[in-house]
């Protein structure tokens, strides 16, 4: 029986008619988190590239030419907010969609992310399906889809 759901994987593979899969640069200092994000995005048709920290991200931008970035905040050498500020300060990456995926869940962190122009802010632990939906939306909308999924001190989500 045919599904009434749209073929999202086919949509992603066509990447808005460009003939290639959308590229996501996953930036996190934890190899486990990088792999978790990568596997979930690859299963949904994204081409995934990995970076260990903000400097590694900036070094890979030209060769990868990502359609979006997932970015942790707390990383060695160059943290996520400093990386994001550099991305927003360069004409070529000023509007590049960025989804923060981090354990930093304070209101001040969310506010700083908004000020720097992130499309979404997901906190760890995150729901892989929500991550995929959020990245897909950021890639295909091109506009801010700011959402904040931040855990409360009791472990529930806002």
Descriptions of predicted regions:
Residues 119:
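Short, glycine/charged-rich "phosphate-handling" switch motifs in NTP-dependent
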Residues 64-70:
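Active-site beta3 strand of CheY-like receiver
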Residues 126-136:
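C-terminal output helix
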Residues 75:
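Receiver (REC) domain active-site loop signature in two-component systems and cognate sites
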Residues 35-43:
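Charged docking surfaces used in two-component/phosphorelay signaling
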Residues 45-52, 60:
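Short hydrophobic/Thr-rich beta-strand motif most characteristic of the beta2 strand and flanking loop
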């Amino acid at each position: 029986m045919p599904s009434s759901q749209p073929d999202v994987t086919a949509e992603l593979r066509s990447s808005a008619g460009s003939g290639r899969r959308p590229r996501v640069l996953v930036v996190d200092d934890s190899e486990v988190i990088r792999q978790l994000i990568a596997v979930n995005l690859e299963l949904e048709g994204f081409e995934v590239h990995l970076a260990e920290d903000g400097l590694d991200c900036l070094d890979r931008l030209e060769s990868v030419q990502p359609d979006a970035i997932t970015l942790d905040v707390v990383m060695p050498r160059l943290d996520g907010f400093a990386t994001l500020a550099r991305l927003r300060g360069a004409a070529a990456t000023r509007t590049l969609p960025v989804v923060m995926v981090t354990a930093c869940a304070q209101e001040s962190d969310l506010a700083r992310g908004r000020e720097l122009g992130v499309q979404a802010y997901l906190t760890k632990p995150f729901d892989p399906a929500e991550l995929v939906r959020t990245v897909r939306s950021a890639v295909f909308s091109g506009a801010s889809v700011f959402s904040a999924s931040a855990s409360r001190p009791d472990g529930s989500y806002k």
